[in-house]
């Protein structure tokens, strides 16, 4: 797919699977196709997702041969027992070793994903994980509360995460510790050192057009959202035969309002009310008033989640959406 006639590509994100399992040749083929058929900005942010145990000395050397300048690593936790419970292959030691190898390969922008809210996890346990992440001197950190979804193995095992009050304390401890360490809390779950926000993720929250390549990948051109077929065999067959492999919908009316709300309100800058139609702006402010009165939202003049509103953001956004 090419966007050479329309826009420069400002960010590339290779993920949504396990790209660190690919060979040097396979990765080079992907990047060659992107760079040959598209206008890629000279300062593009180019991210690859990796598993810590995949970052061997050889993999780090391979990174040096590619245009990658940012790595996102799923550490999840630095507690080996919890990693085994999550059925992750790596250990806490492998996370540290992987980051060391990436630094030696010249990667100066590393993001780590963490998870909190495990069964029986205490605030002390969580603080140890935060401290371990800070000791690695990464530029970016994302943290998500463990969610045990219906139908998953953990749900079938009748496992439960931490209680809501413990999750709340963990979340605000995370914010306080990272901000004290110089990180900017720029989105509900994302923290960055100065100048190291994820440009790719920020483009989603800003409503910037993007192209998704691969099975189940989504794309957005500013007006229409499309999504590829999720079955990998059907996707490959469609690509090989040159047939349509995606469905689409036009983003307008209430759908456009809901999309803007659910992305912009997650950010530190909040929702620019001037981007709403007059009727949607009136509706939004009317519903938001009780949250403003409760100190969960503020108008600055953008609509912004307060510190107290961050933890209950999902509930607030759901209430503000139009059915």
Positions of predicted regions on the chain:
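C-terminal scaffold of the Radical SAM
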Residues: 1-278
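Solvent-exposed, charged/polar functional surfaces in cytosolic regulatory/catalytic domains
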Residues: 33, 177, 290, 294, ...
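Hydrophobic residues in beta-strands and at strand termini
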Residues: 50, 305-306
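Auxiliary N-terminal substrate/complex-recognition segments of SAM-dependent methyltransferases
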Residues: 147, 285-286, 314
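Short active-site-adjacent structural elements
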Residues: 272-273, 299, 312-313
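Short amphipathic alpha-helical interaction segments
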Residues: 277-293
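A short, conserved structural fragment
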Residues: 292-302
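Short, amphipathic alpha-helical interaction segments positioned at domain boundaries
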Residues: 308-323
């Amino acid at each position: 797919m090419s966007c050479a006639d329309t826009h420069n590509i400002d960010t590339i994100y290779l993920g949504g699977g396990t790209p660190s399992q690919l060979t040097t040749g396979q990765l080079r083929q992907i990047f060659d196709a992107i760079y040959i058929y598209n206008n890629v900005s000279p300062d593009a942010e180019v991210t690859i997702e990796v598993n810590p145990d995949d970052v061997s000395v050889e993999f780090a050397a391979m990174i040096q041969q590619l245009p990658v300048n940012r790595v996102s690593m799923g550490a999840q936790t630095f507690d080996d027992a919890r990693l085994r419970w999550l059925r992750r292959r790596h250990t806490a030691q492998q996370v540290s070793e992987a980051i060391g190898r990436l630094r030696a390969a010249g990667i100066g922008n590393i993001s780590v994903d963490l998870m909190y809210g495990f069964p029986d996890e205490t605030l002390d346990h969580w603080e140890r994980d935060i401290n371990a992440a800070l000791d690695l001197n990464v530029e970016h950190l994302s943290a998500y509360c463990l969610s045990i979804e219906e139908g998953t193995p953990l749900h079938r095992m009748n496992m439960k995460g931490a209680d809501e009050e413990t999750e709340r304390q963990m979340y605000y401890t995370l914010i306080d510790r990272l901000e004290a360490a110089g990180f900017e809390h720029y989105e509900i779950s994302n923290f960055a050192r100065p100048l190291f926000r994820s440009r790719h993720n920020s483009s989603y929250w800003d409503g910037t057009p993007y192209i998704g390549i691969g099975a189940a990948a989504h794309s957005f051109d500013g007006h229409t959202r499309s999504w590829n077929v999720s079955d990998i065999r059907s996707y490959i067959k469609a690509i090989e035969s040159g047939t349509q492999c995606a469905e689409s919908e036009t983003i307008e009316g209430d759908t456009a309002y809901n999309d803007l709300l659910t992305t912009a309100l997650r950010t530190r800058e909040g929702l620019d009310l001037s981007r709403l139609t007059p009727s949607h702006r009136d509706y939004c402010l009317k519903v938001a008033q009780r949250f403003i009165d409760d100190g969960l939202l503020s108008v600055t003049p953008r609509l912004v989640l307060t510190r107290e509103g961050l933890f209950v953001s999902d509930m607030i956004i759901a209430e503000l959406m139009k059915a």
